[in-house]
Curated annotation (Swiss-Prot):
One of its GO terms (cellular component) is cytosol. The active site is at residue 11. Belongs to the IUNH family. RihB subfamily. Homotetramer. This is Pyrimidine-specific ribonucleoside hydrolase RihB. It comes from the Bacteria. HAMAP family: Pyrim_hydro_RihB (MF_01433). It comes from Escherichia coli O157:H7.
Length: 313
């Protein structure tokens, strides 16, 4: 099994925490570092959340704080879904884990420039850190093996009728990434909403046990409430974790190559990922877009990672 080297760029966030849990434990993933961006909440809160998850699960991977603001637009947060802390629900022990002193953007640039072109970037929040790194040092572009991101939709948005939250939170950054020429894989809402975490799934992870099972339960029981109140869903989709699933085994997710463009015009479609599903524009595809996921396979993978945190001694 190939071990994929990745940098996980996230804005924790309930589903981000599940992505961290999976990426740090599965043997197919070599998690080099975790970079944090503002998104689901402000940077001070998302950073604390990322550190809390790492401390709770004893994940010894360096964590770097990144961009506190979008490139251009006024900052927004998703407190309607993730609460005031950005990770409401779990109760953590007093935090002793600290972030690295290096800025996340510098870490991304330095790590890529020193690499053999074998590192995959996995941004599952707004694309601010990735876009700024690309603009600061364009020489990183050929060094990026692939970008596997959570964001966008070829159908309906979730923050506006047109736009998904991660892209809407920094459309200009997304525009930079989608025009970069780097190989892109997009896990949008059309796919990620197929991973609704029902009470049955939560009970399954509770039975699996260990610290990750406990954390999963605390996290996803909170989103049961907010996702139903906001979207009428039967549970919280674990949007970000689909990227980790794809990296572990892309055969579990069906994708379609499309030309994708981010709308940065101020108007009702601001932040929309315009996906040319039928190829009517005649432009070459720049993105593999997630279409369907094998949910039985996916939840089995999540459970495998949860069980990996159970100590046997």
């Amino acid at each position: 099994m190939e071990k994929r080297k990745i940098i996980l760029d996230c804005d924790p966030g309930h589903d981000d925490a599940i992505a961290i849990m999976m990426a740090a434990k599965h043997p197919a993933i070599d998690l080099l570092g975790i970079t944090i961006v503002a998104g689901n909440q402000t940077l001070d809160k998302t950073l604390i959340n990322g550190l809390n998850v790492c401390q709770k699960l004893e994940i010894n991977v360096p964590v770097y704080a990144g961009m506190p603001q979008p490139i251009m637009r006024q900052q927004i947060v998703a407190d309607n879904i993730h609460g005031d802390t950005g990770l409401d629900g779990p109760v953590f022990e007093p935090l002793t884990r600290q972030a690295e002193s290096t800025h996340a953007v510098k870490y991304i640039i330095d790590t890529l420039m020193a690499s053999d072109g074998d590192i995959t970037l996995v941004p599952v929040g707004p694309l601010s850190n990735i876009a700024v790194a690309m603009r600061m040092q364009p020489a990183i572009l050929p060094k990026i093996r692939e970008i596997v991101l959570m964001g966008g939709a070829y159908g309906t948005g979730n923050f506006t009728p047109s736009a998904e939250f991660n892209i809407f939170a920094d459309p200009e950054a997304a525009r930079v990434v989608f025009t970069s020429g780097v190989p892109l894989v997009m896990m949008g809402l059309d796919l990620t909403n197929q991973t609704v975490c029902t009470p049955d799934v939560i009970a399954r992870m509770e039975r699996a046990g260990g610290p990750a099972g406990e954390l999963f339960s605390d996290i996803m029981n909170f989103t049961l409430k907010t996702q139903f109140e906001n979207y009428g869903l039967a549970g919280g989709p674990v949007h970000d974790a689909t990227c980790i699933g794809y990296l572990i085994n892309p055969d579990g997710i069906k994708t379609q190559e499309m030309y994708v463009e981010v709308d940065v015009n101020s108007g009702p479609c601001y932040g929309r990922t315009v996906c040319d599903e039928l190829g009517v524009l005649g432009k070459p595809a720049n993105t593999k877009v997630g279409i369907t996921i094998d949910s039985d396979w996916f939840w089995g993978l999540v459970e495998e990672c949860v069980r990996g945190y159970i100590k046997t001694h």
